[in-house]
Amino acid sequence: MGTRQELVTYLWTDIINTYLRDDALDNIVAHCRRRPADPFGDSGPAIERLLAAGASRSDLRLILRATAYEAVFGTLYAIGDPGVDNDNVLMLHEELLTADPSGLEGRPGSADAL
């Protein structure tokens, strides 16, 4: 990554707006079917239940997009204030799942454990 502008452009196009694609929900469901015990493996069945209950695919994608924005914004804000000692953020993404307070690293049932 290069400049600040390149970073925020990447985050917007490749993280936030990825949920606007028509196949976004199908990709999540398919991944969860292949690997149901993986972190957030329970999100695919949740999407299927919402669709079966009549939720609009477009509305669900908008909710996912807004959630992604809030997550990116909150992360960038936290990195800036309060920050990380010695700006030690390299490879921080590898530690994210270990911070799940349920101890399940985001796997199915982790939301229920809170």
Give the positions of each predicted feature.
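Amphipathic protein-protein interaction modules
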Residues: 46-103
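Amphipathic alpha-helical interaction modules
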Residues: 18-68
